Amino acid sequence: MNKKAKSKAAVLLAALGVFALMLAATAWARQAASASFTGKWAVQTNVGSTTRETDYFLTQNGTALSGAILNGYRMTNISEGTVNGSQATWVVVMGTGDQQRRIAYTATMDGDELTITQSGGGGFGGRGAGRGGPMVAKRVSSDGTPVGPFDSLPRITPPALHNVSDGGMARTPPMGWNSWNHFKALVDDATVRGVADSIASNGMKDAGYVFINIDDTWEAGRDANGNIQANSKFPDMKALADYVHSKGLKLGLYSSPGPKTCAGYEGSYNHEAQDAKTWASWGIDYVKYDWCSASVMFKQGDEHAVYQIMGDALRASGRPIVFSLCQYGQEDVQTWGPSVGGNLWRTTGDIQDNWNSMSHIGFDLQVPLTSYAGVGHWNDPDMMEVGNGGMTNDEYKTHFSLWAILAAPLIAGNDVRNLSDDTKSILLNKDVIAVDQDPMGAEGTRVAKNGDTEVWAKPLARGAYAIGLFNRGASATDISVKWSDLKINGKPKVRDLWAHKDLGKVADGYSAQVPSHGVAMIRVEP
């Protein structure tokens, strides 16, 4: 081979070497990128034809890991993130104070798949994942920068304030049933029909329970014209409403003024009038409207105007629809709830099926609110937990009695298809229900407190009173009330509302031994 040929060969070999190095470098870079946890990882779950996505935005820096989790509209930062080879761990802290929960995550990476498990209760992902089951996330981007869920949506300017009619509805506190406390995302058409059948036949309808309310997770997306669609759990919402109506009952739904509901389903943002007309066409009688992702789109002080948008839409829908405001008592809702057409408004955060939650909401948090309720507009301390199993029978009697004295909506939250005798005796206590449904529409107030004992009284029509003697303590105790403290004269007639027994005319006052966490409840008539 001559020198010229050798030179060409050397150049070619050098070029091939450089090319090989470039290929190796590219492969190494790809391998390095795939070996990094940095990126956006998505977990998709399907519930009733609705696809929900949870996004994990992760950034790896050596053995440190940072980022955030986007579930529906909630962006939650991760902490204590570490990487050890193909495995990473991190922690998410949810809630505050005594409601705080630490959720620990472990993730194993295999190329562009991430298998995630979690422990600690609650958390993101499907039902199994929330109890520590695995989720498989796919890498959809190598950029781990968190992106807000609604950055591309137009912003609505809150309207000027004006008064909206209450529609002449809810002249007494609404009574019925709601799916969330017991069924959560597991509610479907068959469940609702079964509940309607039971309420129509087990005495609840006759006692006044008429609303069958479907809470979150019924929603799909929107059609080409922007109309809200129900998901496959509810194949024909109008047919379901017709069925419920055929039982002499009414059907309610749930939505949010934000783009997403609390569970991450389609909200009514920028579709308020359209949704109200759709619901009316289906035959809906009640709408619970939950703030949720509206917190991302509006300032906290905008709540009054934002709820007014849906109040106007419901009143213009052509159908009487009860309007239930659910924004957890923020922004002094009791002062403006009636002016947006609200028939009831939540006064607190969510109730839990335990004594501490129920008693704190019912006794402590309602005291400053009692003057704001009245005919057509009611304080709502949340749905009832009676029959769900987290409290004793005495505690459930206290729960029901207190809600009645508060003139609260009596919305059952248990599986009414299977009522125990104890639960039935509480929910169907017509003496106590009559206190709640009294046409005067006054909310009861706390008239005495002595340590763990409290006396509450509710004015009733024709000069009568309902009086509850409550024992929040750990042991039975005697509790008394004097008629003079309530400006009751003479010897009024007294009826024991749990014993269903007339006690005749009683002078001076009334005393009873009340069990721990229990109640004695009487009706006093002049």
How would you describe each model-predicted region?
Residues 13-24:
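Bacterial N-terminal signal peptides
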Residues 30-138:
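Central antiparallel beta-sheet cores of small beta-barrel/beta-sandwich binding domains
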Residues 173-179, 208-214, 250-255, 285-290, ...:
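Structural recognition of the beta-strand scaffold that forms the well-ordered cores
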Residues 181-183, 191-299:
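Aromatic-lined carbohydrate-binding/catalytic grooves of carbohydrate-active enzymes
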Residues 249-265, 315-332:
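Aromatic-lined carbohydrate-recognition surfaces of secreted/lumenal glycan-active proteins
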Residues 274, 320-415, 436:
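Glycan-recognition surfaces
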Residues 403-406, 411-413, 449-488:
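Carbohydrate-binding surface patches
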Residues 505-526:
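C-terminal beta-strand-rich structural cap/linker in extracellular carbohydrate-active enzymes
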